[in-house]
Amino acid sequence: MGIFSNMRKPKGKLGNIQLKSMNKEHTPLALWNLKHLDIKPDDIVLDVGCGGGININRMAEKAKKVYGVDYSIESVKLSREVNRDLIGQGKVEVLEGDVQSLPFEDNTFDIITAFETVYFWPNIEKSFGEVKRVLKPGGTFMMGMESNGSDNIPMKISKKLIDMEVYSDDELTGFLKANDYSNITVYLRDAKNREEIIKANGEVKRIKDDYDHASFSDKFLEWMTITAEK
């Protein structure tokens, strides 16, 4: 399996290397995504498509317990390794599973996150419905992506090399509305102008964004975080 095709579902030694690299390279984006999430001490959190497990580790600093799920066994193994101590403390659990059939009861989680992973979800509208099933009433679903749509050169190249779909904020909002999510808020980061664009309740506002970004962030002009409630 080639380096690009392996990104969808990391396998073997190459997958392990890629996952460790993503833990590092995606950090600026992930920390920006997490700025828009209010994790409380009693929250039970699920990270879908947990990859290398670093975001599980970050959220476990605030939450009561964090679960991770991924359909890549290599991701599950590395996530367990990264969070070994927290697993031993009972604060983290990592499982193999698929977003279309999550191995949890209805109304289980206060927060569900998806960092850099919805690109690979089959039947995304159905997947959003499955996320909603295991989310508690009033719970929050948060997605983090490095690009708002594919109308930029880096994402156009990525789509050709990797089997992935890059969605715009309007498309994702539409899928959420089709599943009756509420209080949908879109946060877009305009790195060029150092502004954050916030879309909510039919209104758009811009605020100054002084987020201290690494050079990695400048590959994409518009990071995106979307939050929605059940």
Task: Name each model feature, range by range.
Residues 24-43:
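Conserved alpha-helix/loop element of class I SAM-dependent methyltransferases that forms part
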Residues 100-111:
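A short acidic, Gly/Pro-enriched loop at the edge of an enzyme's catalytic core
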Residues 164-180:
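Short alpha-helix
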Residues 139-145:
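Conserved beta-strand signature within the Rossmann-like core of class I S-adenosyl-L-methionine
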Residues 111-124:
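A short SAM/SAH-binding and catalytic strip from SAM-dependent methyltransferases
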Residues 46-101:
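Class I SAM-dependent methyltransferase SAM/SAH-binding core
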Residues 125-137:
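A short glycine-rich, Lys/Arg-flanked "PGG" loop and its adjoining helix->strand segment in the class I
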Residues 146-163:
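Short, glycine-/aromatic-enriched active-site segment of Class I SAM-dependent methyltransferases
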